[in-house]
Amino acid sequence: MDRLATRFHVLAPDTHGAGKGPVWPEDRALVLEDEVTWLEPVFSRAGTPFSLVGHSYGGAVALIAAVHQPERVRALALYEPTLFSLVDAAYLPPNDADGIRQTVERATTALAAGTRDVAAEHFIDYWMGKGVWQATPLARRGAIEATIVNVHGWGQALFNENTPLQAFCALEMPVLLMEGDNSPPSARAVVSLLTQTLPNVELLEFEELGHMGPVTHPEVVNRAIERFLCCNAAV
């Protein structure tokens, strides 16, 4: 974010359950359009048109925002948007989304049992590799465990999204779609479907990076995002 802030007006809002974001609704399952509605004041503050940058869940939210209001979005830079509903719609289970589906179920069960550390281990090891959680310093675990409580909500929103793949055919703005070649099949399956569908897409694969590439290698990923945004600043 600091790198981009030197050249762009950067706004970094929180979604439900994160930072200053609202709590998850208790009376119903949240859908991604709810996130878009929550972010409307930020979009208004950004002015039109604006570019959206998102990773994982945030990338999925950015895609839905663009579908609902394409005239406001100048460009999209997305690192592995996790819109798993697209995989289920294209290929009936069992499919490439099964790994994360099972991980969400196991993490949710662990949370219900009051074992956040177990939930975190399921989630982190799925995305980053077996043993990564046990190798994580104790000083860093608390912050990670605090975010793990969102796993059930994330899973519901991402697997139950009803926007069809064909809707993304109408997105004419430039899209930078990024993935790591060490990422799990679930994330890469979403990227593959979107690459075949988006009409103005650039696919960028990072060698030896995984799903958490923007966190583990921010300079590499942010350099690509900066290049893309600069090239499309006047689109």
Which stretches of residues belong to each language-model region?
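Conserved acidic catalytic loop of the alpha/beta-hydrolase fold
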Residues: E33-F50
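Conserved HGGG/HGGXW glycine-rich cap/lid loop of the alpha/beta-hydrolase fold
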Residues: M1-R28, T48
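Conserved alpha/beta-hydrolase catalytic His-Asp/Glu region
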Residues: A112-H152
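Alpha/beta-hydrolase active-site loop signature
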Residues: T15-G19, L83, G210
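Catalytic active-site module of serine/aspartate enzymes centered on a nucleophile-bearing elbow/loop
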Residues: N200-V235
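Conserved hydrolase catalytic core segment
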Residues: T48-Y91
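A catalytic-pocket lid/entrance helix-loop region that shapes and gates access to the active site
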Residues: T82-A112
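Conserved serine/cysteine hydrolase catalytic core
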Residues: A139-Q196, E202-E205
